[in-house]
Amino acid sequence: MPVRKIRRPSRPQELSAAYMKALDLHMAEFRAGTADRAWGIRDFAERLFVHPTHLSNTLQEVTGRSPCDIYEERLMDVARELLIGSKGSAAEVARQLTMDPSNFNKFFKRFEGITPKQFRELRAMRHSA
């Protein structure tokens, strides 16, 4: 019986997976309310012991997306979760995400097309019907 070689992920795939894992941990800090600030590409690169440009280029190559796009998408997922799962105001959710409330409203609206308040109202209407 021939011996099958186990394919190891390439270094770019490993780096991309390590970024996603670090990103998941950072998003968990937001969910728990323990994040003191939002991380940038330099923060992730430092934790992964690579240059920020190398990390950015590798993520673009492997995923077809920039680290910023990936980060913002994940942050929006957390924002939606917090708006749905908490009774706190949108301003409190913004602060938990280490954002200024007015910037959070703009950020949220850019992705969802509606404000956090409208998002909650729409969600409440759907679940009461």
In which residue ranges do the predicted regions lie?
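Alpha-helical bundle regulatory/interaction domains
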Residues: 1-53, 60-62, 66, 71, ...
